[in-house]
Amino acid sequence: MYKSITTLLKQQPQSILRNYSTDKFPRGFKTGTAACGLKKTGNKDICIIHSSAPCNVAAVFTENKVKAAPVLLSKQLLETNNYKGFNSLVINSGGANACTGEQGLKNAKTMSNLTSSLLKAPQASLVMSTGIIGQQLDMSKVEKGIADAVTTLNESDWISAARAIMTTDKVPKLAQKSVSLNGGEVHIVGICKGAGMIHPNMATMLCTVCTDASISEDCLRALLKHSVHYSFNSINVDGDMSTNDTVAIFANGSAGNKHITDTTSSDFLQLQEAVREVTTRLAQMIVRDAEGASKFVTIKIHGADTEQNGHIVANSISTSSLVKSALYGEDANWGRVLAAVGYSGVDIDPLKVCMWFAKGDGKDVGLGKKNDPETSMQFLEKGTPLAKDENKAAQLLSNNDVAIVVELGMGKASSTMWTCDLTEEYVRANSHYRT
Amino acid sequence: MYKSITTLLKQQPQSILRNYSTDKFPRGFKTGTAACGLKKTGNKDICIIHSSAPCNVAAVFTENKVKAAPVLLSKQLLETNNYKGFNSLVINSGGANACTGEQGLKNAKTMSNLTSSLLKAPQASLVMSTGIIGQQLDMSKVEKGIADAVTTLNESDWISAARAIMTTDKVPKLAQKSVSLNGGEVHIVGICKGAGMIHPNMATMLCTVCTDASISEDCLRALLKHSVHYSFNSINVDGDMSTNDTVAIFANGSAGNKHITDTTSSDFLQLQEAVREVTTRLAQMIVRDAEGASKFVTIKIHGADTEQNGHIVANSISTSSLVKSALYGEDANWGRVLAAVGYSGVDIDPLKVCMWFAKGDGKDVGLGKKNDPETSMQFLEKGTPLAKDENKAAQLLSNNDVAIVVELGMGKASSTMWTCDLTEEYVRANSHYRT
């Protein structure tokens, strides 16, 4: 009766492995990787990213009051150096270097300085770490790993970089996009790791985006904020937020495009759209690969008075354990969804709410939309439940990709979030992570 | 490897069945019950409570914007009648009468009027409903059930009343307390139903407390607010909030105590303490009986700057799926607890946080407390992890009752919440509730 997780949609994220072009990676960036033994499996656990030209950098960090040493160090390095002049980043998996006190901070600095020194970079490296918290990194392993990784630097192996930052991820996560701007074609590549503890506000995830665009620090910051809002802050797996989350973007200007300094320019908007597409695809890969997830769920809110309120309602639905358990059971339990809408904190009118369940991404579903009866069913019309065929509903929800579409009837704003179901496998995976 | 739920602590709540005295029930109240067929099992699904003397009533209702018909009706009846003059309450299980539109409201009124009419009560009955939402009640069954229940009215069978309001509860929930006040001994009895969707702010739970105390409407309201804060609003199962939640207290004055009109009087404080004890025991029974729970978990926060901030931190821990999964796995994962402290929204200083895991209720655990090494282990000292024996930790957490104690080092306020672990059984139970 209960599905084996191994039969589920875990193959999907791997398709990205066949879909990237090595000749479209941003120019001037190299990656190097190594397996230094932090991971008991012997898999790669050190990743270095190096740019021949100095980069402008923007970053968003965890809002958790408990911040890991590499987060504290990287924030400080960025501020001290005015978000520019960076040539390198070092990432380790297999240890979060969080709750590690003064020694932890010292170790993060050692990683930073060793990397920049080996790369002959004029400025200290940024640092990211992921893994178990509360344990000191074995620095003899890490130092050897960094030295080994530097010897492997090359321009085309971004997939190994994506692999080296994995923890409980089942597949490496990489997305790329190119866009023609004034003065040249610009390339973007992003890698990330996710799995458990994913939440709006970016729980336990690391993401690095590199682009050869020429863009000012201020514009880069605005672009990243926008992209993170619509990607990593629009996904939910289990509502926890980690000590290490970081999204950083490096821009080295090697594309030779006309330097972007204006957030209202066409070049800026095109680049922003492209980066948003890269981060959105990465964020969706994280949801698809979430520990124990069996379904990819799109939550679409229409008719909100403001986009922010739409986001609050979408978040309330996507964090409801009862909604997520029902989806796992392929039960179109609109009552639980409506309850989550009702307690979201937004002042909704229950008698204006309409609701649909759909297969796929719910794109053409809702008030005044196509609402193909083969792929969607309406369950609620202005607060009143509609008669429905339970067998057809269960069949709809038997798909791997399903959507819940809610019309609030309050205004014209929309919001979309992505989440997954809550499965027995989630509990199994998370009850024995450390051992 | 994974425990069978049937072997777990489900017996515990039943112990209350042996622990009540029929001669200590509040005077002047009778209960009647019937099985009218709303429950497919044929179990009792109608409960009537009747007081020979008119009662002052206070009530707290769900804050969900989507409110069930009986909630809307009862609120209106209370306001219209200034919270006094009520002789009766009718409750059905097997159907929540929520999202049922005008017809639902009409049905709730029919239940109210039929009950007061059969009881010859001068004022319409209050109404509560629980069960699946979005379906109209079968009123021919309900009306017959109310008529049948009226014929069974008696003073001693509060356990049948507790049984008749159960939905997915495994055991009936009843608590009682007596206290000597000026002018006479006062008795209190409370019944409630809980199970899934339990949250601070009282999700899917109904509770009725009856007392023969003589107390003003205003004092009764103050007393209930206090009691709910420290009981039903201090438990968490899965963070959802339902459309039907109601806690009501009826006071009929039959004890002959000196009428209480002053919230600073000794009589008021004693009665408040007694009611708080009753509601706290009921709230804890709800957690122990939560769908799929295998552990009863006490979260104690000490050293908060304000009680409210302590409550926010406790709530953040008790809603973390990762913390709750780890507890199920008997894994002393202090890192997940610390992460939940860090993202609670309270401005904590990670370098001041201490943390203990304990068996039992964590009462004697914390800074400057006994901290018996047989029953507690400290994992974090001012932000720094302590070396620990993982086997001993797992043994500690193998108990059914466990506690997490956190010292924030910010001030002198404390807060306690009760929750349960997140188990595979929870997901199973909630993925197929409707079918």
From Swiss-Prot, chains A, B:
User: In which domain of life is the source organism classified?
Assistant: Eukaryota
Q: Which Pfam families match?
A: ArgJ
- Which pathway does this polypeptide act in? Amino-acid biosynthesis; L-arginine biosynthesis; L-ornithine and N-acetyl-L-glutamate from L-glutamate and N(2)-acetyl-L-ornithine (cyclic): step 1/1; Amino-acid biosynthesis; L-arginine biosynthesis; N(2)-acetyl-L-ornithine from L-glutamate: step 1/4
Q: How does it assemble?
A: Heterodimer of an alpha and a beta chain.
Post-translation changes: The alpha and beta chains are autoproteolytically processed from a single precursor protein within the mitochondrion.
Site Involved in the stabilization of negative charge on the oxyanion by the formation of the oxyanion hole: which residues? 130-131
What this protein catalyses is: N(2)-acetyl-L-ornithine + L-glutamate = N-acetyl-L-glutamate + L-ornithine; L-glutamate + acetyl-CoA = N-acetyl-L-glutamate + CoA + H(+)
Tell me the GO molecular function terms.
glutamate N-acetyltransferase activity; L-glutamate N-acetyltransferase activity
Q: What else is known?
A: This protein may be expected to contain an N-terminal transit peptide but none has been predicted.
Give me the residues that bind substrate, please: 167, 193, 204, 291, 430, 435
Please report the name of this protein according to its UniProt entry.
Arginine biosynthesis bifunctional protein ArgJ, mitochondrial
The record ties this protein, via CDD domains, to: OAT (cd02152)
- Where is the protein found, in the record's own terms? Mitochondrion matrix
UniProt-listed GO biological process terms: L-arginine biosynthetic process; ornithine biosynthetic process
Task: Report the family membership.
Answer: Belongs to the ArgJ family.
Supply the InterPro entries for this chain.
Arg_biosynth_ArgJ, ArgJ-like_dom_sf, ArgJ_beta_C
UniProt-listed Enzyme Commission number(s): 2.3.1.35, 2.3.1.1
